[in-house]
Amino acid sequence: MIPELIEYALQHREEILENAQSLRVNKKDAIERWIKYNPSSFEREFRVSATDGSLNFMEFRGFMLYAINAVSILYSRNGFEKEVKTGKVGLLPPSENVLERVRAQMGILEAKTTLNLIEEGELDLSLIDGSFISFLVKLRGIENDIKMFINLDPDFMEKYINAINEPKLDILAEEKATDIIGRDLDTDVLLNSMLTLEKVELLNVLIKLFRRYGGKLVAISKTSTSRRYFRYSLKPDLVIFDKLTQNTGFSKPNVVKLSLPKALKNYLDFSEDLMFTVFYARLEPREQVFRIEVFGERSMEDIKKLLDDLSVFTVRGYPYPLRRAHQEVEIRGEDMLRIYRILSLYHEERGREVLL
């Protein structure tokens, strides 16, 4: 290790640790926002799906090699029943948003496997690792790209939405967009705007999920940066509740209302606002707190029933089906190395060779 960094860490150790531990929140404030509730399981038949995705990549000077996959697993009280799984390996040219494109593509596969499994049979809840709100907030600012495509072809968005409605467990954005407009755009413009089209494809699937199965959807996040409850805290709400409460229960819920970009409302045939009930929960004493988002405005009794339902499958404070889904899809470094060897990319430069 570089000596000056060791010296700096030693000299500033107390200051750094103080920042790591500082909450700037009174414990009483956290407890006042926390509702004690001990979830109780039940004996009736119950089926739940769990969805997670994974990504990994290797960067080269001329492209990024990436791999993504997603799985939706169906569980009942008797255990595992079945799964829907898909994935993709590909190359993307360098661009300022290349990693965001990979994340969007992973999201498409997650949403499509979720929809596919729900439509295959009856289930009570569909758990998804992540946040609906985080994705929807990032849609702001895509109107300019949409207008650009409409200027190229006034019927572009209508053609595009119709094309991506194919029931395939695949990413259709680039193929369908280039079928409509060709590849005559400036490369930088095309690469940057392709992210918008991938976001539209993901949103299109999410709208189907919200419209048809909104009451069953539950997004669960193990991490969050939101400070909606404690706006002056250095730490996010999730960390505050995790550190300052120990009982099972949940935070007083917030209702979040979001609007779709105006340029998309007509094409997606979904003009109303999207409402989500957001809260933090702990399912077992002294286990971790996680963030929950459910579609629509929910009552306290709805939330308690949801926690009762989740407790049926909870192991060490977390829904086991989501833990199993994560284990199924995780793409490790050795997996990427194997793909690299299969593709025989040995002669492609990664840009760090001159440092060796």
What are these language model-derived features?
Residues 1-42, 46-47, 106-356:
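Long, contiguous domain-sized segments
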Residues 46-56:
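Two-metal-ion RNase H-like nuclease active-site motif
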Residues 51, 94-99, 187, 191:
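Generic alpha-helix detector with strongest preference for long hydrophobic helices that associate
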Residues 55-94:
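Acidic, metal-ligating active-site segments
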Residues 87-107:
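Acidic/glycine-enriched edge-of-secondary-structure segments
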